Amino acid sequence: MKKTKIMSLALCFALILSGCASMNNTTKGGLIGGGGGAAAGAIIGGLIGKGKGAAIGAGIGAVVGTGAGVLIGKKMDKAAAQAAAIEGAQVEQVTDNNGLQAVKVTFDSGILFGTGAATLSSSAKASLSKFANNVLKQNADMDVDIYGYTDNQGWKNSTAEQSRQKNINLSQERAQSVSTYLMSCGVTSAQIKGVQGLGEESPVADNSTAAGRQENRRVEVYLYASPEMIQQAEAGTLQ
């Protein structure tokens, strides 16, 4: 019975979101903030966080009102536009664990790093510097999570399990390199809530092709409303 209820709720919320394709975050923020509620937000947030051990954004345990959702949506619209101007960044609109709009920024690891390496290239530093200064520091009231991923290719003279662990370690080092560099550009450690390498987990493309493997070698940065931002939005004071 519990499983049936969860599936029904997820389906209902999916139908709500299917009507949002042409809306910006401001409109969707109001719809999700007012109608989705905490339960639906937990489901959608759980889907975003699948394989990460936790959903994006800490659940606040309460329904976020429509007006607050609209204000947060406006902020996310602005952050998404700022991020879209960064070379090498792919921007998507996603939903956090509170059912609120968030921003996902994906960087191709082939652009950031050399093969099998976790040292940032010069061009990567230039892009990340702009990302830090033009996006993260301009939205200091947003929390940030950073996740690193690899393809499923094995390592020379290693078993499948050894390769899997090496890929996890490499993705962790890459995510940490991005985090460390962003902080060197003035982003505070308090803003970056999580840094994790997930190796081969959650591929976004087919690992049987070279193009697919390149897509899977990536670093994802999530920007989502902090508890303080949600409080300000609820109070109507969020700028």
Task: Give the residues covered by each predicted segment.
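Bacterial N-terminal signal peptides that target proteins for export
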Residues: 1-10
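Periplasmic peptidoglycan-binding/anchoring modules of Gram-negative envelope and division proteins
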Residues: 112-154, 179, 221, 233
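C-terminal motif of bacterial Sec signal peptides marking the signal peptidase cleavage site
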Residues: 15-19
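Solvent-exposed coil/turn segments that connect beta secondary-structure elements
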Residues: 88, 94-96, 108-110, 116-118, ...
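Amphipathic, membrane-active segments
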Residues: 75-104
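Extracytoplasmic
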Residues: 86, 98-102, 106-108, 130, ...
